[in-house]
Amino acid sequence: SVQALAGFVTENGGQVDILVNNAGGQFPQAAENYSANGWRSIIDLNLNGTWNVTQALGQQMLKGHGGVICNIIMTIGRGNPGIAHSGAARAGVAELTRSLSYEWGPKVRINCLGPGAIITPGMEATYDDDVLSDIGETPIPQPGTPEDVANGVVFLVSPAGRFITGETLMVDGGVSRYGSNQALKGSDFGYRTTP
Protein backbone atom coordinates (compact mmCIF):
# COMPACT_ATOMS: atom_id res chain seq x y z
CA SER A 1 0.00 0.00 0.00
CA VAL A 2 0.97 3.63 -0.34
CA GLN A 3 1.11 4.09 3.44
CA ALA A 4 3.48 1.12 3.69
CA LEU A 5 5.74 2.69 1.06
CA ALA A 6 5.72 6.04 2.87
CA GLY A 7 6.52 4.27 6.15
CA PHE A 8 9.34 2.27 4.56
CA VAL A 9 10.96 5.43 3.20
CA THR A 10 10.77 7.17 6.59
CA GLU A 11 11.93 4.15 8.60
CA ASN A 12 15.01 3.82 6.41
CA GLY A 13 16.03 7.46 6.78
CA GLY A 14 14.96 8.45 3.32
CA GLN A 15 12.78 11.21 2.01
CA VAL A 16 10.87 11.76 -1.18
CA ASP A 17 12.08 14.74 -3.20
CA ILE A 18 10.18 14.14 -6.45
CA LEU A 19 6.92 12.32 -7.08
CA VAL A 20 5.63 11.60 -10.59
CA ASN A 21 2.10 10.16 -10.63
CA ASN A 22 1.82 8.33 -13.94
CA ALA A 23 -0.77 5.60 -13.37
CA GLY A 24 -3.89 5.87 -15.47
CA GLY A 25 -6.10 4.25 -17.99
CA GLN A 26 -9.51 3.98 -19.54
CA PHE A 27 -11.67 1.75 -21.67
CA PRO A 28 -13.30 3.37 -24.70
CA GLN A 29 -17.06 3.23 -24.63
CA ALA A 30 -20.02 5.52 -25.25
CA ALA A 31 -20.82 7.29 -21.97
CA GLU A 32 -24.43 6.12 -21.91
CA ASN A 33 -23.17 2.54 -21.72
CA TYR A 34 -20.87 2.91 -18.68
CA SER A 35 -21.78 0.69 -15.77
CA ALA A 36 -21.57 2.14 -12.27
CA ASN A 37 -18.64 -0.19 -11.60
CA GLY A 38 -16.87 0.83 -14.82
CA TRP A 39 -17.23 4.52 -13.96
CA ARG A 40 -15.95 4.00 -10.40
CA SER A 41 -12.98 1.93 -11.55
CA ILE A 42 -11.73 4.71 -13.84
CA ILE A 43 -12.31 7.43 -11.21
CA ASP A 44 -10.53 5.28 -8.62
CA LEU A 45 -7.55 4.64 -10.88
CA ASN A 46 -7.06 8.12 -12.34
CA LEU A 47 -8.27 10.48 -9.58
CA ASN A 48 -8.35 8.60 -6.29
CA GLY A 49 -5.12 6.73 -7.02
CA THR A 50 -3.33 10.01 -7.71
CA TRP A 51 -4.76 11.51 -4.53
CA ASN A 52 -3.79 8.53 -2.34
CA VAL A 53 -0.15 8.61 -3.43
CA THR A 54 0.02 12.42 -3.40
CA GLN A 55 -1.40 12.69 0.11
CA ALA A 56 0.83 10.00 1.63
CA LEU A 57 4.08 11.24 0.11
CA GLY A 58 3.05 14.91 0.20
CA GLN A 59 2.69 14.66 3.98
CA GLN A 60 6.33 13.59 4.15
CA MET A 61 7.38 16.46 1.91
CA LEU A 62 5.50 18.95 4.08
CA LYS A 63 7.09 17.60 7.29
CA GLY A 64 10.54 17.52 5.69
CA HIS A 65 12.36 19.81 3.32
CA GLY A 66 9.62 19.98 0.68
CA GLY A 67 9.49 18.51 -2.77
CA VAL A 68 8.02 18.55 -6.25
CA ILE A 69 5.07 16.61 -7.65
CA CYS A 70 4.15 16.11 -11.31
CA ASN A 71 0.80 14.52 -12.16
CA ILE A 72 0.51 13.04 -15.65
CA ILE A 73 -3.02 13.55 -16.97
CA MET A 74 -3.93 13.89 -20.66
CA THR A 75 -4.84 16.66 -23.05
CA ILE A 76 -7.98 18.06 -21.44
CA GLY A 77 -10.29 20.99 -22.03
CA ARG A 78 -11.72 20.03 -25.43
CA GLY A 79 -13.59 16.84 -24.63
CA ASN A 80 -12.55 13.34 -25.56
CA PRO A 81 -15.32 11.26 -27.13
CA GLY A 82 -15.49 7.71 -25.83
CA ILE A 83 -13.48 8.37 -22.68
CA ALA A 84 -15.64 10.84 -20.75
CA HIS A 85 -14.95 8.97 -17.50
CA SER A 86 -11.20 9.39 -17.89
CA GLY A 87 -11.53 13.03 -18.93
CA ALA A 88 -13.62 13.79 -15.84
CA ALA A 89 -11.11 12.08 -13.55
CA ARG A 90 -8.13 13.82 -15.10
CA ALA A 91 -9.82 17.21 -15.00
CA GLY A 92 -10.29 16.45 -11.31
CA VAL A 93 -6.56 15.82 -10.98
CA ALA A 94 -5.85 19.17 -12.66
CA GLU A 95 -8.11 20.99 -10.17
CA LEU A 96 -6.62 19.04 -7.26
CA THR A 97 -3.19 20.14 -8.48
CA ARG A 98 -4.21 23.81 -8.59
CA SER A 99 -5.73 23.62 -5.10
CA LEU A 100 -2.73 21.86 -3.56
CA SER A 101 -0.35 24.37 -5.13
CA TYR A 102 -1.90 26.99 -2.83
CA GLU A 103 -2.23 24.78 0.23
CA TRP A 104 1.20 23.19 0.05
CA GLY A 105 3.27 26.09 -1.31
CA PRO A 106 5.97 27.15 -0.77
CA LYS A 107 7.28 23.78 0.49
CA VAL A 108 5.81 21.68 -2.32
CA ARG A 109 5.50 22.62 -5.98
CA ILE A 110 2.90 20.63 -7.86
CA ASN A 111 2.05 20.66 -11.56
CA CYS A 112 0.40 18.52 -14.22
CA LEU A 113 1.65 17.43 -17.59
CA GLY A 114 -0.89 16.65 -20.31
CA PRO A 115 0.50 14.48 -23.09
CA GLY A 116 -1.23 14.49 -26.44
CA ALA A 117 -0.90 11.75 -29.02
CA ILE A 118 2.27 9.95 -28.00
CA ILE A 119 3.13 6.98 -30.18
CA THR A 120 3.56 3.94 -27.98
CA PRO A 121 2.66 0.28 -28.51
CA GLY A 122 -0.44 0.88 -26.36
CA MET A 123 -1.53 3.78 -28.56
CA GLU A 124 -1.08 1.71 -31.70
CA ALA A 125 -3.12 -1.12 -30.19
CA THR A 126 -5.93 1.20 -29.06
CA TYR A 127 -6.63 3.49 -32.02
CA ASP A 128 -7.57 2.54 -35.55
CA ASP A 129 -5.41 3.45 -38.56
CA ASP A 130 -7.53 6.50 -39.55
CA VAL A 131 -6.98 8.13 -36.17
CA LEU A 132 -3.29 7.24 -36.13
CA SER A 133 -2.82 8.80 -39.58
CA ASP A 134 -4.47 12.05 -38.35
CA ILE A 135 -2.19 12.38 -35.32
CA GLY A 136 0.28 14.51 -37.25
CA GLU A 137 -2.40 17.09 -38.12
CA THR A 138 -1.24 19.57 -35.48
CA PRO A 139 0.86 22.74 -35.60
CA ILE A 140 3.83 20.41 -35.09
CA PRO A 141 2.92 17.83 -37.75
CA GLN A 142 4.23 14.68 -36.12
CA PRO A 143 3.27 12.48 -33.20
CA GLY A 144 5.02 12.88 -29.87
CA THR A 145 7.39 10.39 -28.32
CA PRO A 146 7.79 9.13 -24.76
CA GLU A 147 11.00 11.21 -24.67
CA ASP A 148 8.95 14.37 -25.32
CA VAL A 149 6.86 13.60 -22.24
CA ALA A 150 9.94 12.76 -20.15
CA ASN A 151 11.59 16.05 -21.14
CA GLY A 152 8.50 17.96 -20.00
CA VAL A 153 8.49 16.16 -16.65
CA VAL A 154 12.21 16.81 -16.14
CA PHE A 155 11.62 20.51 -16.85
CA LEU A 156 8.74 20.75 -14.37
CA VAL A 157 10.50 18.95 -11.50
CA SER A 158 13.96 20.47 -12.02
CA PRO A 159 15.27 23.83 -10.83
CA ALA A 160 14.41 25.15 -14.32
CA GLY A 161 10.75 24.99 -13.26
CA ARG A 162 11.27 26.45 -9.77
CA PHE A 163 8.81 29.32 -10.32
CA ILE A 164 6.02 27.17 -11.78
CA THR A 165 3.28 25.66 -9.64
CA GLY A 166 -0.38 24.83 -10.11
CA GLU A 167 -0.03 24.66 -13.88
CA THR A 168 -0.68 22.10 -16.59
CA LEU A 169 1.98 21.86 -19.27
CA MET A 170 0.49 20.44 -22.45
CA VAL A 171 2.97 18.35 -24.44
CA ASP A 172 0.71 17.74 -27.40
CA GLY A 173 2.06 19.44 -30.52
CA GLY A 174 -0.55 22.19 -30.13
CA VAL A 175 -3.61 19.97 -30.52
CA SER A 176 -5.16 21.29 -27.29
CA ARG A 177 -5.22 24.76 -28.84
CA TYR A 178 -5.69 24.14 -32.54
CA GLY A 179 -6.38 20.47 -33.22
CA SER A 180 -9.58 18.68 -34.01
CA ASN A 181 -11.48 15.70 -32.68
CA GLN A 182 -13.06 15.20 -36.11
CA ALA A 183 -11.37 11.84 -36.60
CA LEU A 184 -13.02 10.61 -33.41
CA LYS A 185 -16.60 11.02 -34.62
CA GLY A 186 -18.62 7.88 -35.18
CA SER A 187 -19.98 4.98 -33.20
CA ASP A 188 -16.57 3.60 -32.19
CA PHE A 189 -14.89 7.02 -31.65
CA GLY A 190 -11.85 5.88 -33.63
CA TYR A 191 -10.93 3.10 -31.23
CA ARG A 192 -10.03 -0.35 -32.47
CA THR A 193 -12.90 -2.75 -31.99
CA THR A 194 -12.64 -6.45 -31.44
CA PRO A 195 -14.96 -8.78 -33.36
Pin down the residues of each PLM region.
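C-terminal helical subdomain
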Residues: 5, 112, 132-164, 171-173, ...
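Active-site loop of short-chain dehydrogenase/reductase
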Residues: 14-16, 61-74, 106-108, 167
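Substrate-binding pocket helix/loop in short-chain dehydrogenase/reductase
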Residues: 30-31, 35-43, 134-135
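A short, exposed helix-loop element centered on a Lys and neighboring polar residues
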Residues: 54-55, 98
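Alpha-helical segment proximal to the catalytic Tyr-Lys
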Residues: 59, 101-106, 162
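Catalytic loop of short-chain dehydrogenase/reductase
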Residues: 70-92, 97-105, 117-118, 142, ...
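A glycine/serine/threonine-rich, flexible loop-to-helix segment
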Residues: 112-138, 148, 178-195
